[in-house]
A protein has these predicted regions:
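A conserved beta-turn-beta hairpin within the catalytic core of GNAT-like acetyltransferases
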Residues: 73-87, 236-246, 297-298
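Conserved beta-strand in the GNAT
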Residues: 55-57, 63-72, 226-236
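A short beta-loop-alpha structural element at the N-terminal edge
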Residues: 2-25, 163-190
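Active-site/acyl-donor-binding loops of N-acyltransferases
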Residues: 138-158, 271-323
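A short, internal acetyl-CoA/4′-phosphopantetheine-binding micro-motif in the GNAT/acyltransferase core
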Residues: 85-100, 244-256
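Conserved GNAT acetyl-CoA-binding A-motif
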Residues: 113-126, 269-280
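Conserved acetyl-CoA-binding loop-helix of GNAT-fold acetyltransferases
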Residues: 97-111, 137, 253-267
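Active-site rim helix/loop that mediates acceptor-substrate recognition in acyltransferases
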Residues: 28-55, 191-217
Length: 323
């Protein structure tokens, strides 16, 4: 079996494999879960080659039997500058040895990413995904769980909103980063955004890897009590996708529930469904939304592989001078 970079002549075969996997997923998953996968960087989110991606194919006896695709993080980043890559797709053709092909593709991508100077590879997979062993055996480890909650008709429980609410301002960014560090376990923040600069690069995707919504009306507020203790961003959809709610909140008293109610109030007279992507450590927000008509749509595993260890710059000491 030969692993090589994908070329234009491979596109028809790649699209055929992707459609086949697409059909299987559509038959197995609820429509809303399928839509989430299409709009996020969940494994199976094929990006066109016009975007900045790495794509490699596995070839056996002259026939393409699998492919893998990765992009810079955030999506669209020039790959020459990317130090973090997101695996977007891994497909193996029907009838091929899934373990052998997937393992070889993941190994090749890891080696190529390291040669390009990447520090880490991320991937998100639905739980119980059959391709999970291919990543685990190549050194990927789970660092978080993503929970997507969904409601056909979300309902507020109260019009009592948090004290200190105000619209977000450009100058809030550093305080928002401090809030992110407070609510995120250190093991996660050190992987995803160990510095303010890296957090800013990921902020557009709200730390979920979700593709930016088009044709949506966005509203963003913070809860300011000298320090920021809460943040909510609402994207009211003008198309077929559900409205989107994003949250950060300290797990203090009534704050999660009040922030959830305020977020729902920003949807106005929308009668469509809504969803929100949260992490396992956001259990206070998950519980608050469950009490307002939401239920778990799907659970995804977030995995990472460290390609190169970061070595802190050694501090210069004072050396006595003689003579």
């Amino acid at each position: 079996m030969n692993i090589r970079a994908a070329g234009l002549l491979d596109l028809a075969r790649i699209e055929e494999m992707h459609r086949s996997a697409d059909i299987r997923l559509s038959e197995a998953a609820p429509p809303a879960a399928r839509l989430w996968s299409l709009l996020s960087s969940t494994l199976s989110a094929l990006l066109p080659l016009t975007q900045e991606t790495l794509m490699y194919v596995a070839e056996d006896n002259g026939k393409v039997v699998g492919f893998i695709q990765a992009s810079g993080q955030p999506l669209g980043l020039d790959l020459r500058r990317a130090r973090v890559l997101q695996v977007l797709n891994l497909q193996v053709a029907d009838g091929s040895d899934s373990d052998e092909v997937a393992f070889a593709l993941v190994e090749h991508l890891s080696n190529q990413a390291l040669e390009r100077g990447a520090l880490r590879l991320f991937v998100r997979l639905p739980d119980r995904d059959p391709l999970l062993p291919a990543f685990r055996l190549r050194g990927f480890r789970q660092y978080a769980t993503e929970v997507v909650v969904y409601a056909d008709k979300p309902a507020m429980r109260s019009d009592q909103f948090p004290d200190g609410l105000r619209p977000a301002r450009r100058g809030d960014n550093r305080m928002l980063y401090q809030l992110y560090r407070k609510v995120t376990p250190q093991g996660v923040s050190q992987l995803e955004a160990p510095t303010y600069r890296e957090w800013r690069a990921l902020h557009g995707g709200e730390w979920t890897g979700r593709l930016a919504a088009r044709g949506s009306d966005k509203l963003e507020h913070v809860v300011d009590r000298i320090e920021l203790v809460g943040w909510v961003k609402v994207e009211r959809s003008s198309g077929a996708r559900p409205d989107t709610l994003n949250f950060l909140a300290l797990p203090e008293g009534p704050l999660p529930g009040e922030l959830a109610d305020f977020g729902l109030s920003l949807l106005g007279d929308s009668e469509g469904p809504a969803w929100s992507s949260l992490r396992h450590y956001d259990s206070h927000m998950i519980d608050a939304l469950r009490g307002r008509g939401f239920s778990v749509l799907l659970t995804q595993l977030l995995l990472v592989k460290e390609l190169a260890a970061r070595v802190p710059v050694q501090e210069k000491g004072l050396v006595p001078s003689y003579g």
